[in-house]
Amino acid sequence: MKITKVAVAGTLESSDVQVRVQPFDSLDIEINSSVAKQFGEQIEATVREVLAKLGITAAQVIVEDKGALDCVLQARVKAAAMRATDEMINWEAVL
């Protein structure tokens, strides 16, 4: 999947995460979280895993974490990535 435009998913509410995805020449992940020292590596690993499953190798991803669970982070990354592409989505494969 190729990222062609800027897209955002999520909110800045407590227990949520806002993920911004935009075109970039390589894969760049920025994590802003009050729990980054404890969970920063896990957050980055989750983001990388979701992007790999979607076939994304070039994008800038900015994660503003407010204490979201892993499943919420996965959903937000997936939603932002799908909003940021012009490709047709195979919904049977995604769901």
UniProtKB/Swiss-Prot annotation:
GO terms for cellular component: cytoplasm. Keywords: Cytoplasm, Phosphoprotein. It is found in: Cytoplasm. The modification O-(phosphoribosyl dephospho-coenzyme A)serine is found at residue 14. The keyword Nuclease does not apply. Belongs to the CitD family. Oligomer with a subunit composition of (alpha,beta,gamma)6. Covalent carrier of the coenzyme of citrate lyase. This is Citrate lyase acyl carrier protein. It comes from Haemophilus influenzae (strain PittGG).
